[in-house]
Amino acid sequence: MDAPSTSSGAQSKLLMPGDDEADEDHQNRGDPNLQQKQKIQLNVDPDYDDDEDDDCFIDGCEASAPITRELVDGAIERRSKDRNVKMSIGVYDEYDDDDDDEEETEEDQRRRFVEGIRNIRHKQQESFDLEEHPIPVESEAMRQFINQQVNNAMMFNQDNSEFQHIEFEPIVKQKGPKIIEGYMWGGQIGTGSYGKVKECIDMYTLTRRAVKIMKYDKLRKITNGWENIRSEMSILRRMNHRNVIKLIEIFNIPAKGKVYMVFEYCIGSVQQLLDMEPARRLTIGESHAIFIELCQGLNYLHSKRVSHKDIKPGNLLVSIDFTVKICDFGVAEQINLFQRDGRCTKVNGTPKFQPPECIYGNHDFFDGYKADMWSAGVTLYNLVSGKYPFEKPVLLKLYECIGTEPLQMPTNVQLTKDLQDLLTKLLEKDFNERPTCLETMIHPWFLSTFPEDQGLGRIMERMRTGDRPLTMLSSMTALYDGITPEDELIIEDNLGIIQQILPINLTSEAVLERGSFPGFKFLEAKPGDGPDGVEGSEDSAAPLGPQRRPSSRSMPTCAPPGPAAGNAQNSTAENGAETDGVASASDPPPTAAPGAPPRRRKRNFFSCIFRSRTDSA
């Protein structure tokens, strides 16, 4: 026998009684029901091919008798068994007159209905029966394998020392260098009211820069944030002086919602130099060198009719060659070209460095140039003594002290008469009597010379010998795999001479601190150094902890640390219980006389409104 064909074009073969036309006419005349029986078809697999050895049909012979049911059933059973071909008879028995359907009684219908309901309930139970649906063999084997591995890894068997330690090596993916607009990003080197400052390096010129990053959302929340940024950009674009920070580039990325301002790089600020000293002050020569650079920068700004209005040590940056540069022009104001003086109307700046005409508010205007000179005088006072000329823990008391109290010279350092005279003139409460920048530059103390003015002294030595911060160190290392600054390089020349190159003296830290200058001699604190609250105390000679920078919008005015426990009573007796104007809640109320009606405790009007911002912290 031939195998069954799988051709898609095979036609199904119809087995009908009498394939011959003559035999068909004879049967049509003899049998009246033949037309109905001719409609009966045998549905056979369409892939079935004719077989010459079939017993039902013999080549060259006509059918001797009509095909009976027994003959067809036998052929179907035989061929299904031999060839695995499924064959079925469609409506073969549909018109069998011998099979008469018996009429179903009412009892049979009831029995059939009950049996159907029972089958439905049985199927629903099988769907929830777990025994009828066993877990596949593959899943059970996988579960056993996982349980075995977990038991071995979790060290449940303490006797077996093979699994006492789990070897775990996390996959660490090194972060690649971040490059935006041709600048490789480094670490953060500072923060401000409008954003943070990061170090970067120009990929084309290999020059270190500092980028100021400002977010759109933060600028919207700050009052006049966008206006101040636009003013700073317009002013810095026109500035070109060695004592004014230089603006390199400005670019904007709307997709990130950030504005970037690229400046020249500086290693730190004057405030950081003060914080590194245990005495919180500099020498007279170092202060003189910084003040000369400050006045030269202010003279240039005033010649361009620009008032900075926020001069303080935190806004004076120091370059690698110890050049002081004025920065942070966020509140600076461009004065009208047709004005004869430096009239300004917007009051901005740090409270401790603001002049009396700004904090009082009793003038319709103030001179911006004279306000900068007041701030320069406070800065000079802070550099030489480590203190502020007017300082109170509460903002209202601070303003009152600036406007009414006379100037007191510091007692922890010895000042010359020329320096005292200059401080007195710069801190004159009447701005009409206050000297201008040109008048200050011809003062005798300003014209005097110190070794620090010629690049000598402690600070210049520190700048030459200290570690150089480089926050792009990790990013630059990632560009060249296998080369690290800590590795010692051994080079052999053509003559066979081996030369060993020591590792580069770099650090990835961004903040100047005492650890950056090993072996450097700092100014030790003496009695009287530090804030006014600890003046004259025995413990003031000890190194002071890190303090916050002067007050700003992001860092409000903080109260100085309280006196020591041993001198608490003396300081209270000298200063008085109501110096700060805030009634202490821990003090017991005064004892009333016997028989007198109870009196309510008097409270200062400002104790609720102007409660110290930092006392609660």
Curated annotation (Swiss-Prot):
Keywords: ATP-binding, Cytoplasm, Developmental protein, Kinase, Magnesium, Manganese, Metal-binding, Nucleotide-binding, Serine/threonine-protein kinase, Stress response, Transferase. Its cofactor is Mg(2+); Mn(2+). GO terms for molecular function: ATP binding; calmodulin binding; metal ion binding; protein serine kinase activity; protein serine/threonine kinase activity. GO terms for biological process: asymmetric cell division; asymmetric neuroblast division; asymmetric protein localization involved in cell fate determination; cell differentiation; determination of adult lifespan; establishment of cell polarity; establishment or maintenance of cell polarity; positive regulation of dauer larval development. It catalyses: L-seryl-[protein] + ATP = O-phospho-L-seryl-[protein] + ADP + H(+); L-threonyl-[protein] + ATP = O-phospho-L-threonyl-[protein] + ADP + H(+). Belongs to the protein kinase superfamily. CAMK Ser/Thr protein kinase family. LKB1 subfamily. This is Serine/threonine-protein kinase par-4. It comes from Caenorhabditis elegans. The lineage of its organism: Eukaryota, Metazoa, Ecdysozoa, Nematoda, Chromadorea.
